[in-house]
Swiss-Prot record:
Full protein name: Xylose isomerase
GO cellular component terms, A-Z: cytoplasm
GO molecular-function term, one example from the UniProt record: magnesium ion binding
Residues where Mg(2+) 1 binds: E181, E217, D245, D292
Membership in a protein family: Belongs to the xylose isomerase family.
GO BP, one annotated term: D-xylose metabolic process
Keyword Ribonucleoprotein part of the UniProt annotation: no
Active-site residues, as the UniProt record annotates them: H54, D57
Protein's UniProt keywords contain Cell wall biogenesis/degradation: no
Binding site for Mg(2+) 2: E217, H220, D255, D257
UniProt remark on cofactor binding: Binds 2 magnesium ions per subunit.
Assembly behavior: Homotetramer.
Length: 394
């Protein structure tokens, strides 16, 4: 099937993805460093509309002002030449040894102050480049030993830092939205705000909760053995899906960062169906479809760009399959038989309270639970139809 990306698809990639040199805990890099300017041009060629980056992805840590200015100027020139945008930026608070116990929640107060300053500088650059979202991944915010971290105090410090970032953005007129990226573990033994639910609960405790949402990642949620599509549906319900990271993962193990759809394909299908078709047949999410993956260590740069194209192609193919699934009359019949739409009908009648419900004998005293319990919902048939559409068998 021929599919072609357009800017309206809003596909974006992290500079750290295609630029990953494939160095891991057990082996050295298998690829040379990628020039950010080349990354911009290559991503534009394959149909991306945006590129994102950590501060240290673009400007190496410790660079002097002259070097920094030169790199940023070259990057901006490439953006102008290609039309690529920077929809989101983020900050590296996890690589340098100073962050070995975290950034915002380090036990060392001086590290916490340094971390906030580092993020403020990245916010300045992000605003200069037109970014609308700042992602916050607390990869080192956590502990290996319960006795080593006062979690209550750590959450206080987390809140203190995020409140300051929001105030800075508003005072400077940046208008940024902030998206917390959850992850259960790795690199820390246990990371604070490990799942989408934890992060959504946390942002309600901030001074400006309307400015904060989440950036869930496929692999991160599935590392906790959670259903990613259900998590995204709840984030949408809370109106807290500010950004999304797409990749592939085979269940609860280390963070694999595979190409999107190269892990749990059926869940990827249901996710795209949710994002594109929503609960009412209209797109449920209008933000970037951001790929946060790692091109396999086995690949050279030809393979890197093939993997980048694979992410786009997988998403577009799943989008087409989901569209066909929703348009199939047999699927519509199966959905009706399964009473999927009936869940939108309020359980109580208009104006009804517990007194009226208690007075309704048909709801309990005269209710034939055995007869209703004997009826099937037809969920297996519905799922089979979904799989057949996914496989292109219908």
């Amino acid at each position: 099937m021929s599919v072609q990306a357009t800017r309206e698809d809003k596909f974006s990639f992290g500079l750290w993805t295609v630029g990953w040199q494939a160095r891991d805990a057990f082996g050295d890099a298998t690829r040379t460093a990628l020039d950010p300017v080349e990354a911009v041009h290559k991503l534009a060629e394959i149909g991306a509309y945006g590129i994102t980056f950590h501060d240290d992805d673009l400007v190496p840590f410790g660079s002097d002002a002259q070097t920094r200015d030169g790199i940023i100027a070259g990057f901006k020139k490439a953006l102008d030449e290609t039309g690529l945008i920077v929809p989101m930026v983020t900050t590296n608070l996890f690589t340098h040894p100073v962050f070995k116990d975290g950034g915002f929640t380090s036990n060392d107060r001086s590290v916490r102050r340094y971390a906030i300053r580092k993020v403020l500088r990245q916010m300045d650059l992000g605003a200069e480049l037109g970014a609308k979202t700042l992602v916050l991944w607390g990869g080192r915010e956590g502990a290996e030993y319960d006795s080593a971290k006062d979690v209550s105090a750590a959450l206080d410090r987390y809140r203190e830092a995020l409140n300051l970032l929001a105030q800075y953005s508003e005072d400077r007129g940046y208008g940024l939205r902030f998206a917390i990226e959850p992850k259960p573990n790795e690199p820390r033994g246990d990371i604070l705000l490990p799942t989408a639910g934890h992060a959504i609960a946390f942002v309600q405790e901030l001074e400006r909760p309307e400015l904060f949402g989440i950036n869930p990642e496929t692999g991160h949620e599935q590392m906790s053995n959670l259903n990613f599509t259900q998590g995204i549906a709840q984030a949408l319900w809370h109106k807290k899906l500010f950004h999304i990271d797409l990749n592939g993962q085979h269940g609860p193990k280390f963070d694999q960062d595979l190409v999107f759809g190269h892990g749990d394909l059926l869940n990827a299908f249901s996710l795209v169906d949710l994002l594109e078709n929503g609960p009412d047949g209209a797109p449920a999410y209008d933000g970037p479809r951001h790929f946060d993956y790692k091109p396999s260590r086995t690949e050279d740069y030809d393979g890197v760009w093939e993997s980048a194209k694979a992410n786009i192609r997988m998403y577009l193919l799943l989008k087409e399959r989901a569209k066909a699934f929703r348009a199939d009359p047999e699927v519509q019949e199966a959905l009706a038989a399964s009473k999927v739409a009936e869940l939108k009908t309020p359980t109580l009648n208009p104006g009804e309270g517990y007194a009226e419900l208690l007075a309704d004998r048909s709801a309990f005293e005269d209710y034939d639970a055995d007869a209703v319990g004997a009826k099937g919902f037809g969920f297996v048939k519905l799922n089979q139809l979904a799989i057949e559409h996914l496989l292109g068998a219908r």
